[in-house]
Swiss-Prot record:
Transmembrane intervals: none
UniProt-recorded Gene Ontology molecular function terms: aminoacyl-tRNA deacylase activity; ATP binding; magnesium ion binding; valine-tRNA ligase activity
Protein name as annotated: Valine--tRNA ligase
InterPro entries, A to Z: aa-tRNA-synth_I_CS, aa-tRNA-synth_Ia, Anticodon_Ia_Val, M/V/L/I-tRNA-synth_anticd-bd, Rossmann-like_a/b/a_fold, tRNA-bd_arm, tRNAsynth_Ia_anticodon-bd, Val-tRNA_synth_C_sf
Amino acids binding ATP: K557
Motif ('HIGH' region) on chain: 42-52
Self-association and partners: Monomer.
Enzymatic reactions: tRNA(Val) + L-valine + ATP = L-valyl-tRNA(Val) + AMP + diphosphate
The gene coding this protein: valS
Coiled-coil ranges (or none): 880-944
PANTHER family: VALINE--TRNA LIGASE, CHLOROPLASTIC_MITOCHONDRIAL 2 (PTHR11946:SF93), VALYL-TRNA SYNTHETASES (PTHR11946)
Origin species: Escherichia coli (strain K12)
Role this protein plays: Catalyzes the attachment of valine to tRNA(Val). As ValRS can inadvertently accommodate and process structurally similar amino acids such as threonine, to avoid such errors, it has a 'posttransfer' editing activity that hydrolyzes mischarged Thr-tRNA(Val) in a tRNA-dependent manner.
Matches recorded under NCBIfam families: PRK05729.1, valS
Family: Belongs to the class-I aminoacyl-tRNA synthetase family. ValS type 1 subfamily.
């Protein structure tokens, strides 16, 4: 084997070999249980980020683990067309390169441009997924806009429409005036900001007066520009100031519209003035109030968020109406919405109707992609009736057909599902699945899989002109069908029969509503088992937390704290990293801060660590459902682990290749160490499998690390040396056999988490075991064997380890050279301790560097010694002649003085009231912890001084 482990040399060629050999495909053995995971489809034009790497590592670990258990295993791969995101990228690209908009291109040509861009950059993410070692079946790769999936989308739309579960309605939606499309509630980001509350007088009509004799109402509003669309004023029916005015009218300033005063709980007597203007076409709460009181709706805004030249007036059901004039005063027409706000306030003030302006804290909705303020807008949209679909989806989780890991996410799911709103599925975009609905010139709507079907079903002749709906479906509509559409539905395919319901869904909690809930609803509606019972899309949902930076901040381009997973695999120089973090930024003014921070954190760029080290780190950090603070130190630690495994394997191979390892017969004697490591490994298998079976990847990674580093490398390889240096033929055969057996099993155990290094080493080790199989990927996963439990070997070896560690600690504390042979005395031995010494003298002498071991009679005090207590015995190391008493006492006095200095420094700090008042709790706790540590160290040194002074 190569002297040093270099992941760059082995990982890519190995992956290409695996893929070429078809090892990632299902084995097709239907007598075995199936196991299937659907990858959450990443955006086709995106690139891999830490969240992807994290989730995909967890998925690949599960898939490899199940595949090695002989299951018929499919990891279904694919990408998402990502409507808004992709369209925005391409629009920005043509604007920057050609100075054009999508409208310059026209719909068809612009869509062609997006397909071109997909062909160009769509391969980035799949290339990166290969670098992570993902064992997905590439031959089954799907794309949400491929022909099969597009057919499934049409099928679902048509069927839901025919069942009256999809309808078209005029409703208020979140409108992004920059992107000119409806967006969902989940894509709205609410930001806190400082604003104003304007108090405006609305004159009462017909000589009416308030209880205190005023001839106007004062209405408080944060959005004076929408006054132009008011159709009512609400007061609380219990409010003594105004309740007698309910049913009377006010005259709306600026437009002189006569609008009613309605009694509604929405008006809060304690808030503002108690009178609320109602603009049903421009506010979600007002929309509901308007419905309750049958108020008309007046839309005053264009889709760009400017004031219209003439308003659109609708009745409460959304039909056009002439109940009010559509005129808008000329001075406000075509004004941008925030300019209109200033103009309306100035005009009201000029009329003497502006009573006061108060500062006010606001929550303002922004679009998370367009980045501008969202406008509630009255538009025609397509909706799915969600309550009907939600009922069985709630029951599936209640009765345990679907389980969430961790369980607390079930509550989040229930709270949303039990209060579910109809889902707006239409988007005013060009990129996506176009809605399969057509209109004739009279405005009648026809839904079908294609235009021919529509004409045939509705007996429409060639002379009837039809135009297809311009809108596309929300991206999440096609994603909701992912578990079954990818397997060939609506055809009844073998894949659907074998792999659905799927086994586990790995997802971030941030898309539990966007995606998880909708998959459950859609799947249960369309997929039934042979008895007609709705099928769930998956049995388990494993929720991951978010990956944050080392300070717990969310990773984002504007913070400049994003780490590309592949930069940790392959390494990146500082100049390249700076370019990546500060090049073409949306907010260039942040570049300097980001540059400084990056230079401080990565003065030499990022070293290459290899894929296995990255995967091991991600698995080790995967404590269920919690957010993870990324830690470069952990990554270095797991790269060191890979080096350690490599070097240990080289040691094993150097001692076994070309030797008799007992696989072809011959007498074998197992030493205590051999029996111990076999028993220890058997227990490790049991604990490791339990951790993986319960989705505790962090615990599994910890078990693997502990066994490999501490038990196998640090102890067992040391414990083999006495046999290797002077054992009989049978003992040598036994130890070589054990070395090879445990290493080969350990490689299989570790393979799901660190696939590359394990396959590479295994190819060398398999020869020694007489294994002829081609790949570790398809080897059986290690099984716990209850008959191999060896309590005696475990107990005896633990005792020997205690004794060796005790001697090593005495050397360290007394400053004795590691190579100097020592005399060991044992006092007060139990029968077990004496037996253990007598049976394992050679081991003890070699590993603890002892020249002699003597068991003292019970009453023998022995010479002046340093002592340690272990289980069933007291260990003594005589000190005479080992150290220079004066020098050692002087050294210890120096150490004590140094520690006392640190103690008084911290005590002064903690006694400083200013420091304690100002410093964060965590900083104070850390100082107290340091103080305790120093106090313990001082006590130990004083103990050593006493021992040496007594010599």
């Amino acid at each position: 084997m190569e002297k040093t482990y270099n992941p760059q040399d082995i990982e890519q060629p190995l992956y290409e070999h695996w893929e070429k050999q078809g090892y990632f495909k299902p084995n097709g053995d239907e007598s075995q249980e199936s196991f299937c995971i659907m990858i959450p489809p990443p955006n086709v034009t995106g690139s891999l980020h830490m969240g992807h790497a994290f989730q995909q590592t967890i998925m690949d670990t599960m898939i490899r683990y199940q595949r090695m258990q002989g299951k018929n295993t499919l990891w279904q791969v694919g990408t998402d067309h990502a409507g808004i995101a992709t369209q925005m990228v391409v629009e920005r690209k043509i604007a920057a390169e050609e100075g054009k908009t999508r409208h310059d291109y026209g719909r068809e040509a612009f869509i062609d441009k997006i397909w071109e861009w997909k062909a160009e950059s769509g391969g980035t993410i799949t290339r990166q997924m290969r670098r992570l070692g993902n064992s997905v079946d590439w031959e089954r790769e799907r794309f949400t806009m491929d022909e099969g999936l597009s057919n499934a989308v049409k099928e679902v739309f048509v069927r839901l429409y025919k069942e009256d579960l999809i309808y078209r309605g005029k409703r208020l939606v979140n409108w992004d005036p920059k992107l000119r499309t409806a967006i969902s509630d989940l894509e709205v980001e609410n930001r806190e900001s400082k604003g104003s509350m304007w108090h405006i007088r609305y004159p009462l009509a017909d000589g009416a007066k308030t209880a205190d004799g005023k001839d106007y109402l004062v209405v408080a509003t944060t959005r004076p520009e929408t006054l132009l669309g008011d159709t009512g004023v609400a007061v609380n029916p219990e409010d003594p100031r105004y309740k007698d005015l309910i049913g009377k009218y006010v005259i709306l300033p600026l437009v002189n519209r006569r609008i009613p005063i309605v009694g509604d709980e929405h008006a809060d007597m304690e808030k503002g003035t108690g009178c609320v203007k109602i603009t049903p076409a421009h506010d979600f709460n007002d929309y509901e109030v308007g419905k309750r009181h049958a108020l008309p709706m007046i839309n005053i805004l264009t889709f760009d968020g400017d004031i219209r030249e003439s308003a659109q007036v609708f009745d409460t059901k959304g039909n056009e109406s002439d109940v009010y004039s559509s005129e808008i005063p000329a001075e406000f027409q075509k004004l941008e919405r925030f300019a209109a706000r200033k103009a309306v306030v100035a005009a009201v003030d000029a009329l003497g109707l502006l009573e006061e302006i108060k500062p006010h804290d606001l929550t303002v909705p922004y679009g998370d992609r367009g980045g501008v303020v969202i406008e509630p807008m009255l538009t025609d949209q397509w909706y799915v009736r969600a309550d009907v679909l939600a009922k069985p989806a709630v029951e599936a989780v209640e009765n345990g057909d679907i389980q969430f890991v961790p369980k607390q996410y079930e509550n989040m799911y229930f709270s949303w599902m039990r209060d579910i709103q109809d889902w707006c599925i239409s988007r005013q975009l060009w990129w996506g699945h176009r809605i399969p609905a057509w209109y004739d010139e009279a405005g009648n709507v026809y839904v079908g899989r294609n235009e021919d079907e529509v004409r045939k079903e509705n007996n429409l002749g060639a002379d009837v002109v039809l135009r297809q709906d311009e809108d596309v479906l929300d991206t999440w509509f096609s994603s909701a069908l992912w578990t079954f559409s990818t397997l060939g539905w609506p055809e009844n395919t073998d894949a659907l029969r074998q792999f659905h319901p799927t086994s586990v869904m790995v997802s971030g909690f941030d898309i539990i509503f966007f995606w998880i809930a909708r998959m459950i609803m859609m799947t249960m509606h369309f997929i039934k088992d042979e008895n007609g019972k709705p099928q769930v899309p998956f049995h388990t949902v494993y929720m991951t937390g978010l990956i944050r930076d080392d300070e717990g901040q969310k990773m984002s381009k504007s913070k400049g704290n994003v780490i590309d997973p592949l930069d940790m695999v392959d390494g990146i120089s500082l100049p390249e990293l700076l370019e990546k973090r500060t090049g073409n930024m949306m907010q260039p003014q942040l570049a300097d801060k980001i540059r400084k921070r990056t230079e401080k954190q990565f003065p030499n760029g990022i070293e290459p660590h290899g894929t296995d080290a990255l995967r091991f780190t991600l698995a080790a950090l995967a404590s269920t459902g919690r957010d993870i603070n990324w830690d470069m130190k952990r990554l270095e630690g797991y790269r060191n682990f890979c080096n350690k495994l490599w070097n240990a394997s080289r040691f094993v191979l150097m001692n076994t290749e070309g030797q008799d390892c007992g696989f072809n017969g011959g007498e074998m004697t197992l030493s205590l160490a051999d029996r111990w490591i076999l028993a220890e490994f058997n227990q490790t298998i049991k604990a490791y499998r339990e951790a993986l079976d319960s989705f505790r990847f962090d615990i599994a990674a910890g078990i693997l690390y502990e066994f490999t580093w501490n038990q196998f490398c640090d102890w067992y390889l040391e414990l083999t040396k006495p046999v290797m240096n002077g054992g009989t033929e049978a003992e040598l055969r036994g130890t070589r056999h054990t070395l090879v057996t445990v290493l080969e099993g350990l490689l299989r155990l570790a393979h799901p988490i660190i696939p590359f290094i394990t396959e590479t080493i295994w190819q060398r080790v398999k020869v020694l075991c007489g294994i002829t199989a081609d790949t570790i990927m398809l080897q059986p996963f290690p099984q716990y064997d209850a008959s191999q439990v060896d309590e005696a070997a475990l107990a005896d070896t633990e005792w020997l380890k205690q004794a060796i560690v005790a001697v090593r600690n005495i050397r360290a504390e007394m400053n004795i050279a590691p190579g100097k042979p020592l005399e060991l005395l044992l006092r007060g031995c139990s029968a077990d301790a004496e037996r253990r010494v007598n049976e394992n003298r050679g081991f003890l002498q070699t590993l603890a560097r002892l020249e002699s071991i003597t068991v003292l009679p019970a009453d023998d005090k022995g010479p002046v010694s340093v002592t340690k207590i272990i289980d069933g015995a007291e260990l003594l190391i005589p000190m005479a002649g080992l150290i220079n008493k004066e020098d050692e006492l002087a050294r210890l006095a120096k150490e004590v003085a140094k520690i006392e200095g640190e103690i008084s420094r911290i005590e002064n700090k903690l006694a400083n009231e200013g420091f304690v008042a100002r410093a964060p709790e965590a900083v104070i706790a850390k100082e107290r912890e340091k103080l305790e540590g120093y106090a313990e160290a001082k006590a130990k040194l004083i103990e050593q001084q006493a021992v040496i002074a007594a010599l």
